[in-house]
Amino acid sequence: MKRIFLFLVTNIAVLLTLGIVANLLCAFLYGTSVEQVIGPEWTVLLVYAFVYGMLGAFISLLFSKPIAKMSCGAKTIDGTEGEAERWLVATVEDLARQAGVKTPEVAIYPGAANAFATGAFKNSALVAVSTDIMGQMTKEELRAVLGHEMSHVANGDMVTLTLVQGVLNAFVIVISRVLASVLANAGNGEGGRRRNNGGLYFLLVMVLQLALGILASLIVMWFSRKREYAADAGSAKLLGTPSAMIAALRRLGNLQPGVLPDSLRAMGIAEGKKTSIWSTHPSIEDRIEALQNLGAGIM
């Protein structure tokens, strides 16, 4: 409920901010309001930004669990399938209790070494691990991986990342169109009011939306990498030591992490051996260094 309230408050704040920024820009350039530059479509634009940018991202999150299961072929387990499954469910239950959240659904999916968490609410999440990671890791390493995913759940990272993406989507939609309208109608001599420059306007919208979208993606990736450090630290705290998480990361460094669908990449345990500004995860070496610097005294 707290996250939903935050989502609604953020939506209102974003729309107000966009209105203020757009009006200041038009006042500075033309000495008039954004409604005079863009026309009556301004209100429609704000509604479109809200529905497509904000609600679209949140609706995707609401359906994230069934989408994740279908995209990865994940099968929910209850611990009655065998000894390995029983241990997996019991471990997730224990970590959930320590993290102060309800036990999420537990699933296994076929594929290379990886794991992920998803779900719109921390008390109704899904944690899934691949068959390969179960076979390649020791129980202590796998427990650390599960602790990492449970930290994502407890921290509400799925909602927070969706909120960031939604806010940026709305900014890209509105700012690209405001700038396109300003540039397309520059020097028309009528206070910036839009005239028959439709072709130029739509060309500018496409270019600006692409450029601003790339910038927005970089911000989302940066934020995702920060949340990975927090999830690693959360795993270390749940287990009482960073050593198991360090061992799990080293193990992953010797494997080829499985590729997850784009919608799940940010919530996986690893993305690949290399990292860049486009990566959802820091490099394994940087994550290990951060855990080593965490220090036993902080634990």
Spell out what each predicted region is.
Residues 75-89, 216-238, 275-282:
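Active-site metal-coordination segments of metallo-dependent hydrolases
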Residues 150-169, 243:
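Catalytic Zn2+-binding segment of zinc metalloproteases
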Residues 1-5, 9, 161, 179-244:
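Metalloprotease/metallohydrolase-associated module, dominated by Zn2+-dependent proteases
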Residues 13, 146, 150-154, 167, ...:
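Active-site His/Glu-centered metal-binding helix of metallohydrolases
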Residues 43-69, 93, 97, 205-219:
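Transmembrane alpha-helices and immediately adjacent membrane-cytoplasm interface residues
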Residues 60-159, 258-261, 278:
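Peri-catalytic and regulatory segments of divalent metal-dependent proteins
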Residues 1-57:
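N-terminal low-structure segments adjacent to metalloprotease catalytic domains
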